[in-house]
UniProtKB/Swiss-Prot annotation:
GO terms for molecular function: DNA binding; histone binding; nucleosome binding; transcription antitermination factor activity, DNA binding. It comes from Neurospora crassa (strain ATCC 24698 / 74-OR23-1A / CBS 708.71 / DSM 1257 / FGSC 987). The keyword Transferase does not apply. Residues 1209-1306 form the SH2 domain. This is Transcription elongation factor spt-6. SUPFAM superfamilies: Nucleic acid-binding proteins, Ribonuclease H-like, RuvA domain 2-like, SH2 domain, Tex N-terminal region-like. Pfam families: HHH_7, HHH_9, HTH_44, SH2_2, SPT6_acidic, Spt6_S1, Tex_central_region, YqgF. SMART domains: S1 (SM00316). Keywords: Chromosome, Nucleus, SH2 domain, Transcription. Transmembrane segments: none annotated. Its main location: nucleus.
Amino acid sequence: MSNSMRDLIDGEAELDDEEDDESFDEEAGDRPRRRPNIDDSSEEEEDDEDEEEARKIREGFIVDEDEEDEAEDSDARERRRRKKRRREREEEEQLDEEDLDLIGEAIPEWERKPQPQRLKRGHRDDHRPTERRGLAEIFSDEDEEHDDRGYGRPSGRAQADEFDDFIEDDYPEDDEERRHREEDEEVARPKDRGLNIDTTGLDKDALEDMDAIFGNGEDYEWALQLEEEQEHAERTKEDIELQDVFEPSQLKEKLLTDEDNRIRFNDEPERFQLDRKAFKNLQMTSDQFKEEARWISNLMLPSKNLSSELHGPFNKAVGKVLEFFVIDGVEVPYVFQHRRDYLIHAKKMRNPNRRDDPDAPEYTVDAEKLLTQDDLWKVLDLDIRFRSFLEKRNALEQTYDKLKEKTRDDILEEMIRQAQSIEELQDLQDYLNFQYSAELKDLAANDNSAQREIKRAGGRTAQFERIRRSNAYKFVQALGITPDRLAKNILRESSKVTSEDDSRLPDDLADTLVDADFPTGELVINAARQMLAEEMFASPRMRKHFRKNFYGMGIVSCRRTDKGLRKIDEANPYYEVKYLKNMSIADLAVRPELFLKMMKAEEEGLIEIKVSLENDREFRQQLFSDFASENFSELADKWNAERQKVIDLAFDKLVKVIVKGVKDSLRTACQDELLKTCRELYFKRLDQAPYKPKGMVIGTTPRVLTLSNGMGDPNREPVSWVSMDEDGRILEHGTFTNLARDESQREALAELVRRRQPDVIGISGFSADTHRLIKDVEGLVSEKGLVGPEYDDPETNEYRSDLLEVIVINDEVARLYKDSPRAVADHPSLNPMTRYCIALARYMQNPMKEYAALGKDVTSLQIHPYQQYLPQAKLLKHLETAMVDMVNLVGVDINVAMQDANTAHLLPYVAGLGPRKAQLLIKGINKNGGVVTSRDELVGDPERHKLPVLGPRVWNNCASFLFIEYEPTNPESDPLDNTRIHPEDYDLARKVAADALGLDEEDVKAETDENGAGAIVRKLFKDDEQDKVNELILEEYAEQLEREYQQRKRATLETIRAELQVPYEELRKKFESLTVDQVFTMLTGENRDSLCEGMIVAANVRVVKDDFAIVKLDCGIEGRIESHDVSYRHSIKDVLHVGQVVQAKLIDLNRKEFVSKLSMRDEEMRRPFRRHFDHGRDQWDYRKEDEDREELREKDKSTGRAQRVVNHPLFKPFNSTQAEEYLGSQPSGEVVIRPSSKGNDHLAVTWKVADGVFQHVDVLELQKENEFAVGRVLRVGKYTYQDLDELIVDHVKAMAKKVDELMQCDKFQKGSRNETEKWLTTYMDANPNRSTYAFCIDTKHPGYFFLCFKASRNSRVNAWPVRVIPHAFELMKSQYPDVRALCNGFKLRYQSEMLKQQSGGR
């Protein structure tokens, strides 16, 4: 890599003295620390404070004396080292602004924003920060004796100085107060401390005269001390590199480690480097490369459904694709776009239509697609798997080669080369370790590299080595054929060899074989059985036979555990697999999510998965018949009985290891299938062009107006809106109220539309009430006659305009964006709902960009209902491949990406690039002036003084996918740089253009000599004659290229034809409108599985009339209950009243209109809802299901347990785990009331504190009318409430508000306690003269936070627990009403603790 390229990233850094606190706010790391043992419970929490814990925490103030001494000695040394000359730093040693962006900002690495410079005042502002020492030393009496700080202030001020650092950034006074305070401090600096008269030998009058003339020598010491401080700062700057300032985890997160730099500068595609990182030392021979092509072809062919005549071309295509990947180093998009001819099998045939039509072409080409773009990713994945397979095989061969000098094994010789999977290689490795454990131990003495593997093998097989060396092994040989020979018999790999019976009975033979190791015949027989069973177990051919049968005849069944009996109820997602049985491997292959659900339930201990053979009995019998002798006698029967015992021993061991392998392989296969489905679904979301207004060309960016009511009622709560132009600029934003009835607001919206003329109105929200907003806006558009832009109607050839379209927007990206650090950085002054509307507008203008901006957060999207059963790393990788395909299909305007951060988010997905190389690209272009005029200059242009930005191989990958808009007025602008044509094919494109224009070689030469190489294509565009390329017969030209130059360019020529007519044409599908079901799910959170007809649901009564009632379901939709569906005996008003929560059966659900019909009739309620599962009659254990229902019923009777129901809309019949699962997707502060495990005089309230943190509040009920009624008095610790609503509002919601207040504080860190402590340490390393503190959430004790603080660079990090209580915070038994009071209280408490410590130590 050239030096000029390496200059693009600076390795070392000089830190600015005035670095803002905010530059470290997002940094976090890990350091294991001891947590305070705050009392808590996973079910219901106690409210008592742990006094012992408080004592332990206070003990944390004791500072190590060595630490104090070191700090003091260090200060003394620094004070002695004065007047050191300042050294200039080299440019490459500086931590430049862009590097700091990479570390400190939570926005994309390539986004560059000008940083505001901190203004420095005159000497008044430049006071010297207090030197840091140990906590105990701050208040030491020795300060008065040894104070040489150069200040005139008394030493008692040291305590206040230390404390000032804590207050530094918190709630400062206004500017005027601060200015006066600083001036007062400045004036106080040269204050005379006075001299001791007794030590001078002068009288008082003489001293006064001397002071008046000369001063006391300290008047200007503050200025000298300031100079000393600056020199000290310069010394700390020297030789600082990134790893000196930031934690390794932070550097890794920001891609700034040494390994990241190697990837960044190495001229190989970034994704290739990451995928092959584990195999970078693997060298493949040409034979192995050919073997890999065959291996991949054999794995892919079964799923391709190609005719037999295409098998050969398919194998060649796979080999060629591997060559492109491995040898040429080009990525999938490049191969698919520029080597497409190798993915197609073209066959030239005579045209049968020529007989009737002489003008018809003589030949036609029949093309068959061999490999799709998805197949290319599969080949790439299998390439990595083959490398893993090859590496393991090489290691096995190396071990065997060392053994071959002493022994030869036909099984290994034959089967190593036959192995086709990792499983088979592992079988051979196990066989080698078992069969040759003694030999491997001998090798270990001479080969330390094999020590680990050999030790493992020797330890496991020591007892069998003892048998192998003893006489007992002769009994093993007498039992008959070897396990390998038996496996050959079963597999019919050669002529059958039968076992021969010894002439003696087994017992008699055993008696003759006794020795010191096995002194009795019985011990000899037992040892022989164990030995032969182990040989069968270790036999690779036997395992192959078992594995083949389990894959072909295996059946999978589930058996619930005792834990799963009650936990997996009918509402649990695992109920679908609780009683499954007799599922074949083929059945699970078509429903991969089912097996993944089984595996997850098994991991949680809820079920056991049993894999067995459908033909188990026949399989065992076949195994025995091929092992038994064919003789008929008592002797033969005795020997066959021994053989049967051996088979029984070996069978169970073999089944265990094979079943484990089958389950692992099946899980991998099911994951691959589900990942493929996720990729396809995500690709569909990406494959959307911007919304296209009528009359516009697809791909045109629309002007958009977006509105949202969020969670609120649109008739009562504000409706946020944003108007965005076609360039993505926010023109206006604001709020409306009550667009349904307030005419002034309706007119304001109409005026906004007329003023800004949007092409479309988009609406979305978080609740079913959004449906009302949609209806209101649609009615307003119709009533006011609001129309979209004019367009040319092709039917009438006249201009017309239609009513403005109102559409519902998919808001999955906007929900993630509105509160994200990126959104706050983009729009710090806007509220979350406005940012939400901005994201909605951007989504309509380009969905792909919004998805790309998510980065790794893309896995937070609900792509597939079962994606939670997939490994997140695998899911992310597959989703990224879909993004890579789409980004390279659409292309990236590199100059737009340099100016627009949203476009720059696409760069990591361009072929050849990645996050690291995208950073390199942006930085390199900036160094070259910030603008790219041609694709070629990215690899350097010395004549124009352009440094190389990318290496040749990476450039070759990405060149055609980075386009540059053609400027006809710029003679250096090449129109081909604005097309999908690769620079390697520019000459071909120019030849096509010349032929289309009818220019001969002389005309071409004259044109190019005068106007450059791009002159011909420029002329084609200038003359507007692109359509002439359609007249060319490109097939003949393609044949000529293949015949004369061995270049297959048919598809490339077609691409050239298309690009010369419409450069970078929009190839995405049109913007996709949401379906009725998708809108319903988005606004209610319910799908057809979670809410459907027949379910019994909770309903809150809103209106009661004489003949019907209106209710509202938990999901927000309205329901209607007719009077005859309530009761035949009573009036509806006697049964229902407003505010009542009732149970009702859902009779009809209109998802389009968000309305439902319900019934409360007894006969309807008595019929429970049964979820239908798609399985065969013989695949569900109905008998076991009925038995379990009866068992649970009996248990409930015996324990007196009954399902409690509370008449409240927030009540759910959940346990703690179900409550947490339910609240997991809800916003923080949401609440569930549920039964308590403590009995019917308790209730439990679970509320969401933060993501993944839930508090369970125990509510004691007093003054109950009966066992199941809610108590008139509800007690939570020392708090008492009159009803549930009061408890929710004044207790839970009050605490949630305090939690939100603390988490919005700028001193709050989002990471764990370990990460926060790491952040404090990092901050202090970068700012050694400051003190700081931060809050973080205590995830182990919901409702608590940690207040972590570090008083000086050398002091330890301390942590105090902060408890959230209703309307306040509690710290050390003291309560504080808000965060500001809490912070000030902490500082006073800290000062008090330090004074206590000092007084106690005197």
